[in-house]
Regions:
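A solvent-exposed interaction/effector surface
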Residues: 1-143
Length: 143
């Protein structure tokens, strides 16, 4: 695991909002919708899709399932756009089943604390593909 700096990025996609215990179902439905509408996202930066997760407090999360795009990309109807500022992140690569990603994020958060950094609640997972690719770049944003 390394600490890296990412430049500002724009993500356009489908938003899922809910309590942690419902995220599995909600996120699965969100990905289905995104795959159905992915071609409407223009000016994508790469072929892999991302999930940006933000812990809003009290066990409530907001997820955007989408694609990194150019800053000038148009937001399709029914989708949302978020702007992530430049920031430092703990970075790791995950290969293998998707079910292992949550565990890896937990390890990354603990690692960041061991380095004296506090995570700010934003997680970035880049690596989703319609055919279920197994390589994911994981990022835990630091305060």
């Amino acid at each position: 695991m390394d600490v890296v700096r990412l430049e500002p990025m724009t993500v356009i996609g489908v938003v899922v909002d809910g309590p942690f215990d419902q995220l599995g179902t909600l996120v699965s439905q969100g990905w289905k919708r995104l795959w159905d509408e992915a071609d409407s996202i223009q000016d994508r930066l790469g072929d892999r899709f991302v999930e940006v997760s933000e812990h809003l407090g009290d066990g409530h999360y907001r997820e955007i399932l989408g694609a990194r795009v150019t800053a000038s990309a148009r937001t399709p109807d029914g989708m949302e756009r978020i702007e992530l500022p430049a920031a430092s992140y703990v970075y790791s690569v995950h290969t293998g089943p998707l079910e292992g990603i949550a565990v890896r994020f937990g390890e990354m958060q603990e690692h960041s604390r061991s380095l004296g950094h506090e995570p700010d609640g934003v997680l970035l997972d880049e690596g989703y593909t319609p055919d279920g690719g197994q390589l994911h770049d994981l990022y835990v944003r630091l305060r």
